[in-house]
Amino acid sequence: MLRASSKRLQLSWQVFRRFQSSNPQLSFPCVDQAQERSRQFEQSLQKQQACPNSVDPSASITSPSLSSGPEPVYGKIVSGFKKFYHNKPFLCDHGGILPKFEIAYETWGTLNKDHSNAILLHTGLSASSHAHSHPENTAPGWWEQFIGPGKDVDTNKFFVICTNVLGSCYGSTGPSSVDPGDGKHYATRFPIITVNDMIRAQLLLLDHLKIEKLYASVGSSLGGMQSLTLGALAPHRVGRIASISGGARSHPYSIALRFTQRQILMNDPYWNRGFYYDGVPPHTGMKLAREVATISYRSGPEWEQRFGNRRADPSVSPAFCPDFLIETYLDHAGEKFCLQYDPNSLLYISKAMDMHDMSASHQRSLSENRKKNQHKLDKYLSADVSAEEIIKLNEDTSVLPDVPYQEIANEDRAPEPDPETNLIAGLAPLKDTPVMVMGVESDNLMPVECQRETARCLEKAGNKQVVYHELDANESFYGHDTFLIYRKDLDLVGGKLKKFLELS
């Protein structure tokens, strides 16, 4: 009897399996959303091809914005800036040549008669020149609360200049710009650039503005790297330097994070080796890369207080798409950014950050590289050089390593300069310049040891005017983004910067 019943159950189960799964397939609305965006792009591109004078296909495709918590004010800036045009060939550190370039910039305050009150404000990776609102662009800037009459960067006293860095996409020449050689987007034909190259371009802007010496150079994150670099390349052109959440060289953890973001982006099939400008952009890779970046921009303690391990809606079944509050936050951060910034600019500028190293040996290597490549510029300036020769001059020689990853034991390595001694020598040009270095203990992207090392090496290089500030976890748990966050009840960055700038 029991045996017969068992056989009937087995037969019923076999019949069930033939016609129906034991469980329904999960739904993936986040995947559907990405596919729908691609479909919208493809439809818009088809319409644009049929009607060439139609609007940019990305204009009608929107992403949600973040509304909860203190968040940076970043946006896609397409107007309201001035332009500096450099119409001569520009040799980059790694041998590439730009036939000409443009730098977008904005200014606040009034330049005094002897042009001695100018502050150059350097941006982070994805920021535009729009640090503060003005009549030509009334939208709030990314440092809106820090700049203005009587504020931390006081425009009653100072003439503030903010540029969009070389390689970016908000008015300055970058991969999305048109190559004058063939009238097409540079894409990944744009040359590899360094932080030093960014500074050389900015110095040419200062020449154009007839500013021989800045009152101060101020920057955070990538901007902090630029600020220090300006002081090292042209110490005679700056009176004081503020570097916030930056450093004199990139940390391996930071390099690893940015490398991961680039790999995610480059493996989006729509990236197409950088040639996506006439097609669908790599929006999914860009979104995921931004989510990884956002993890590095903030801190665990803040998120524990803000999100904990709470689900967005406990009444629904768990899902692989955004489910926990922290997941929905990351998803929104990625959505907000994925169509605002050029993916190739992210590749180029993040790589420049990775290569940032102010040690004496590295700077010497770059200098030797420039001398070695000077013949390219000379040939470029020659009237009889052909287009084919120019392409050959800039030919890429990068290859994968012959040997896979290997951990090299310290005793087997070729002799190298002591890192700290090397960095001290590299920072020697700054020994007579007052420098403020600020770090944040909760910073995951640029660990506070980077700022401690920078201040320590400046002092050992003979600089007796180093001011060091470190915000501990009780003062700020906002991580790397601390420099972007303004709170009336907390003196995070602004008050310390104001005191340094106005110190006689």
Swiss-Prot record:
Pathway it works in: Amino-acid biosynthesis; L-cysteine biosynthesis; L-cysteine from L-serine: step 1/2
Location of the region described as Disordered in the Swiss-Prot/TrEMBL record: 49-70
Localization of this protein: Mitochondrion
Residues that coordinate or bind substrate: R290, D481
Class of enzymatic activity (EC top level): transferase
GO aspect biological process, one term: cysteine biosynthetic process
CC annotations in GO: mitochondrion
Important for substrate specificity as annotated region, ranges: 124-127
Domain AB hydrolase-1: residue ranges: 117-395
InterPro entries per the UniProt record, alphabetical: AB_hydrolase_1, AB_hydrolase_fold, HAT_MetX-like
Domain of life: Eukaryota
Biased composition (Low complexity): 57-70
Residue positions of the active site: S221 (nucleophile), D443, H480
Site positions per UniProt: Important for acyl-CoA specificity: R258
Primary location group: mitochondrion
EC number assigned by the record: 2.3.1.-
Classification via SUPFAM superfamilies: alpha/beta-Hydrolases
Catalytic activity: succinyl-CoA + L-serine = O-succinyl-L-serine + CoA
Keywords linked to the UniProt accession: Acyltransferase, Amino-acid biosynthesis, Cysteine biosynthesis, Mitochondrion, Transferase, Transit peptide
Residues making up the signal peptide according to the UniProt record: none
Entry keyword Ribosomal protein: no
GO molecular function, a single term: serine O-acetyltransferase activity
Pfam families: Abhydrolase_1 (PF00561)
Similarity remark: Belongs to the AB hydrolase superfamily. MetX family.
Function: Transfers a succinyl group from succinyl-CoA to L-serine, forming succinyl-L-serine. Also has weak serine acetyl transferase activity and homoserine succinyl transferase activity.
Entry protein name: Serine O-succinyltransferase
Organism: Schizosaccharomyces pombe (strain 972 / ATCC 24843) (Fission yeast)
